[in-house]
Regions:
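Alpha-helix-loop-beta-strand connector modules within alpha/beta enzyme cores
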Residues: 42-58, 80, 85-101, 129-154
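Hydrophobic faces of well-ordered beta-strands that scaffold small-molecule active sites
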Residues: 4-10, 27-31, 56-58, 73-75, ...
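Structural motif
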Residues: 23-26, 68, 111, 142, ...
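Short, acidic/polar
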Residues: 10-23, 60-63, 100-107, 154-159
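Catalytic phosphate/metal-binding cores of nucleic-acid and nucleotide-processing enzymes, i.e., regions
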Residues: 1
């Protein structure tokens, strides 16, 4: 497996044109700001992503993602709403979401999530407790969906990610 075959995501909380345009083209953005929803900010991010041909996902707001014609929506682990699966989506609209446990994976399956972000795979500043490689592999097998590694991903553990063969990975610190 080559790195260029992996799906790669990063998160953004506010409009930053230089950050968005400096990322390699392959990296998809997830707009995630739970403190405030600033539609103008989201629109600027969306327009720039479309201009530079970068995928954009809106976190925890499916209606807005559909309205903007975004590439998809990101459903966080704390969102347990099973009515998500009843929305009408365009053909290539993707639902992606995060999970940390078997129970959360089951909920994501019931929500018809296409790709599940399992986290945290490695220790990071926010969470000292992590899944580790073996627990990650167990959860990956149970998910029966494309799985994305998330949490504590740094340059020094990219080889470990390659070994466990996920569909991709997501990181904040790796790209900042």
């Amino acid at each position: 497996m080559h790195y260029n075959k992996l799906l790669i995501y990063t998160y953004i909380e506010k409009f930053d044109a230089s950050f968005i345009t400096s990322l390699p083209k392959k990296i998809s953005l997830i707009y995630r700001n739970y403190e405030k929803t600033n539609i103008n900010e989201i629109l600027k991010i969306y327009k720039l992503c479309k201009k530079v041909k970068r995928k954009i996902f809106i976190s925890n707001n499916i209606k807005l993602a559909i309205k903007l014609n975004a590439d998809g929506a990101y459903i966080p682990s704390f969102n347990n709403d099973l009515n998500i699966k009843y929305f009408k989506f365009k053909k290539n609209f993707e639902l992606i979401g995060s999970a940390h446990t078997y129970k959360e994976i089951q909920i994501k399956k019931l929500q018809n999530i296409d790709k599940i972000f399992l986290s945290p795979i490695f220790e990071n500043e926010k969470k000292k407790k992590n899944l580790g490689i073996y627990r990650f592999l167990h959860l990956k097998k149970y998910a029966k969906r494309e799985v994305i590694c998330l949490g504590g991903i740094k340059k020094q553990n990219l080889k470990k990610i390659k070994m466990i063969e996920p569909a991709g990975f997501a990181s904040i610190s790796l790209f900042r």
